[in-house]
């Protein structure tokens, strides 16, 4: 899932004028930095979000767009579907040949 998110972030960077390498590097570094900060501090992701947003700022504008697009709901659904599929494969259903 994270690779898809990094790719989409990089595509967004290219869309607003960055070259592909810069966009990919910035996207990957953003994800890496956030993950490291969460692991090192033990902070809740919501706390990290609050730390990096300011009223009317760029981060909150991007977060609002993600929420409007249903990213939270979509990620939860992806985990649920993957879990269901894993259980199906564990039972050896006839659909496992399509995986």
Where are these regions (language model features)?
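NAD(P)-dependent Rossmann-like dehydrogenase/reductase catalytic/cofactor-binding core
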Residues: 24-99
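Anionic-ligand binding region
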Residues: 1-25
């Amino acid at each position: 899932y994270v690779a898809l998110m990094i790719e989409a972030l990089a595509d967004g960077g290219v869309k607003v004028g960055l070259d592909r390498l810069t966009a990919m590097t910035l996207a990957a570094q953003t994800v890496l930095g956030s993950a490291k900060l969460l692991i090192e501090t033990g902070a809740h992701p919501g706390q990290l979000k609050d730390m990096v947003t300011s009223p009317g700022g760029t981060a909150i504008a991007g977060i609002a767009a993600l929420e409007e697009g249903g990213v939270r709901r979509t990620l939860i659904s992806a985990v649920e579907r993957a879990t269901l599929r894993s259980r199906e494969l564990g039972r050896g259903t006839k659909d496992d040949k399509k995986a």
